[in-house]
Structures are given as structure tokens and as C-alpha cells.
UniProtKB/Swiss-Prot annotation:
It comes from Calendula officinalis. A motif (Histidine box-1) lies at residues 106-110. InterPro entries: FA_desaturase_dom, FAS_N, Fatty_acid_desaturase. Keywords: Fatty acid biosynthesis, Fatty acid metabolism, Lipid biosynthesis, Lipid metabolism, Membrane, Oxidoreductase, Transmembrane, Transmembrane helix. Expressed in leaves, flower buds and developing seeds. Its main location: membrane. Its EC number is 1.14.19.-. Belongs to the fatty acid desaturase type 1 family. This is Delta(12) fatty acid desaturase FAD2. Residues 1-29 are annotated as: Disordered. It is an enzyme of class 1 (oxidoreductase). A motif (Histidine box-2) lies at residues 142-146.
Length: 383
């Protein structure tokens, strides 16, 4: 059973027991290598099929189009009481489907869509721009996240605070209402704040922004493609502006804005729960290495949404080990690598609502264990 999970007590009539104590992931250098793990995975799991990859794009966009048609032609004709219920349902369902589209674009950024980089970048640019994501900008910062996962100094996103970095105001939010408020703000504003102001991102000595070609996030050779990302965003914004002029701002907000808000919320939630858990360590430069860093992630269970999100939720450990592997092979690979990883593999089946509150409560900052001089840091919550 994975860290933080629950189990049924067979002698207690099936009643739930108290949660088991969360066991820490081993932080010593593992007795296996990336090569050992790769050898165990069937070779076909690394094959990328253009036809199969496009089939997922077609499927997702078909479902999204059907939902759009229903909302545009029927929800707007409903009487007010029913419309007030139908619109949030549309936003939630369409947002989930478009999150799947987002995941495919993310896969393009990893060169996991096809064997052709130009095709991956073209598809990724179109899909991500439609969702107001700067494709190349995020592709490069996300690549650095994969290169530095688990490093408290060089990871790119959801970098945990050290105890010394916790603001004095945090104590006023360290209560149930404060945690709920923190979650609401994070899920609604976290994604645009990260892209625009690098909130929760790696520390840079000057302003870092995903829309700025001269941002310290990027190297000189990457800057031209940041302009392309910005052009893609501006093109979509222009289309939305024209739609607002012809169909009205309310139409744009209900048909596009609501689902996009759900997409943005899921992106933050999924990433947060993939890399935040009381069992997971972080490392400074004296201890960090790529393999241990890649293993500081955890698979989760989103129920039926696992499939809607193309299993980015429950195969994330495998994804961090082999990011060019297409999502439709990731589950098979995950099943194969579990016995090799042993306790280094983490899965938590805790319900998502409970998990996001628990992690907000328990994972406020990281610190070393007392009287330990190594560079291993663990989540704490005592302010």
C-alpha cells in the first residue's frame, strides 16, 4: 500500500481505522540505476505512434465540440433556475476534457507525441495557445523542472519554503478557514500568477516571467521561441476579443472562461499533489542527484478522471523517469517498475479533496531532522 493510504480492518466489520502513520520514502541512494529500470520495461512502451497520438487529440476535441454545441444551443435557452445549475456543470465537464487536451500538449513539449520534433511543437503550440499557455516558454521551464526535481535550490515549480522563509503572516492562515482560503486562491489564481510573476517558482535574482523573452528562466538560444509563444497567446486573445465584440463578453466568459478556470485549477492541483506529500524528501546540493530527485514524486488516484487526464495523475513517477514515453504506455510501464522501485515508489489513494487539504495543512515548509547534518529536508507544519 502506498504512503498515506487507508486500509480496512477486517476484524472491525469493514469500518475504517485511523490513517496509518505516513512512512517516509527512503532517501539513501537507491540500489538500482535508471538503466536497470529501463531494461525491465518492454521496448514497445517507448514507441511513439503519430496515428495513436492524434486519435487522442481527435477524441478529446470531438467531446469538447459536442459539449460546446450543447451549451451554446441549449443551456442558453433554459430558464434561469436551470441555467444556473447547467452552466457550472458544463464548466466542470468541459474543463476536465480540456485538461486532457492540455496534457497532450504537455506531452508534445516532452517530445512524447511523435518521432518528429517539428510536429510535436506544432501540435503543442496550437493546443496550448488555445488554452492561453505559452507553449515554448512553459516547455523550457518545465524541462528544467524535470532536470532538477526535488532540489530545493534549482527546481522550477512548487519549490518548498525553508523554515526561515516562512512569512510571519502564515500563522494566521494555519487554521481551517485559512487553509480553505489558501486553496481557493491557489486553485483560481495560482497558474496565471506562476506564469506571470513566477509565484511558487524557483528564486531568481531578478524578475522572472514566462512571457518575457529576456527572463532569467531562458537561455539566449531559447528567446526567439518565447516570442513565438507570445504570438500564439496574442492570436487567441485577439480571437476572444473579436468574439466578445460580436457575441458579447458574457458569451465568452460562459463558453470559454468558465472551462478555462477549471483547467487552470486542475493544473495547479495535479502538480501540487504530484510533488507535495509528507513522505517525500527534498535535497540540497550536497545530497541531490537526478534519480533520487525524480523519485520525489507520487502517483494519485483521481478515479474516472485518471483516464480523462490521460493517466498523468497515476503514472507520474514513470513520467519523471522517462518523460518521452507516451501516456498510453505509461500504465504498463508503471506496473513493471513498481517491484524494482520497491519503497522508492509512492502511491497515495487518499481521496483528492482530503489529500489537498491534508497537504496544505501538513506541508508548510521543509527542514532537516534535528541533529542531522545531511542535506535531506522533510515537510513540517509547526510554525
Amino acid at each position: 500500500m502506498g504512503a498515506g493510504g487507508r486500509m480496512q480492518d477486517p476484524t472491525n466489520g469493514g469500518n475504517k481505522t485511523e490513517p496509518e502513520p505516513i512512512q517516509r520514502v527512503p532517501h539513501e541512494k537507491p540500489p538500482f540505476t535508471v538503466g536497470d529500470i529501463k531494461k525491465a520495461i518492454p521496448p514497445h512502451c517507448f514507441n511513439r505512434s503519430v496515428i495513436r497520438s492524434f486519435s487522442y487529440v481527435f477524441y478529446d476535441l470531438t467531446i469538447a465540440s459536442i459539449l460546446y454545441y450543447i451549451a451554446n444551443n441549449y443551456i442558453s435557452t433554459l430558464p434561469s433556475p436551470l441555467a444556473y445549475v447547467a452552466w457550472p456543470v458544463y464548466w466542470a465537464v468541459q474543463g476536465c476534457v480540456l485538461t486532457g487536451v492540455w496534457v497532450i500538449a504537455h506531452e508534445c513539449g516532452h517530445h512524447a507525441f511523435s518521432d518528429h520534433q517539428w510536429l510535436d511543437d506544432t501540435v503543442g503550440l496550437v493546443l496550448h495557445s488555445f488554452l492561453l499557455v505559452p507553449y515554448f516558454s512553459w516547455k523550457y521551464s518545465h524541462r528544467r523542472h524535470h532536470s532538477n526535481t526535488g532540489s530545493i535550490e534549482h527546481d522550477e515549480v512548487f519549490v518548498p519554503k525553508l523554515k526561515s522563509g516562512v512569512r510571519s503572516t502564515a500563522r494566521y492562515l494555519n487554521n481551517p478557514p485559512g487553509r480553505i482560503l489558501t486553496l481557493l486562491v491557489t486553485l483560481t489564481l495560482g497558474w496565471p500568477l506562476y506564469l506571470t510573476f513566477n509565484v511558487s517558482g524557483r528564486y531568481y535574482d531578478r524578475f522572472a516571467c514566462h512571457f518575457d523573452p529576456n527572463s532569467p528562466i531562458y537561455s539566449k538560444r531559447e528567446r526567439a521561441q518565447i516570442f513565438i509563444s507570445d504570438a500564439g497567446i496574442l492570436a487567441v486573445v485577439f480571437v476572444l476579443f473579436r468574439l466578445a465584440m460580436t457575441k458579447g463578453l458574457t458569451w465568452v466568459l460562459t463558453m470559454y472562461g468558465g472551462p478555462l478556470l477549471v483547467v487552470n485549477g486542475f493544473l495547479v492541483l495535479i502538480t501540487f499533489l504530484q510533488h507535495t506529500h509528507p513522505s517525500l524528501p527534498h535535497y540540497d546540493s550536497t545530497e541531490w542527484d537526478w534519480l533520487r530527485g525524480a523519485l520525489t514524486t507520487i502517483d494519485r488516484d483521481y478515479g474516472i478522471l485518471n483516464k480523462v487526464f490521460h493517466n498523468i495523475t497515476d503514472t507520474h513517477v514513470a513520467h519523471h523517469l522517462f518523460s518521452t514515453m507516451p501516456h498510453y504506455h505509461a500504465m504498463e510501464a508503471t506496473k513493471v517498475i513498481k517491484p524494482i522501485l520497491g519503497d522508492y515508489y509512492q502511491f497515495d489513494g487518499t481521496s483528492i479533496f482530503k489529500a489537498m487539504y491534508r497537504e496544505t495543512k501538513e506541508c508548510i515548509y521543509v527542514d532537516k531532522d534535528e541533529e542531522v547534518k545531511d542535506g535531506v529536508y522533510w515537510y513540517r507544519n509547526k510554525i
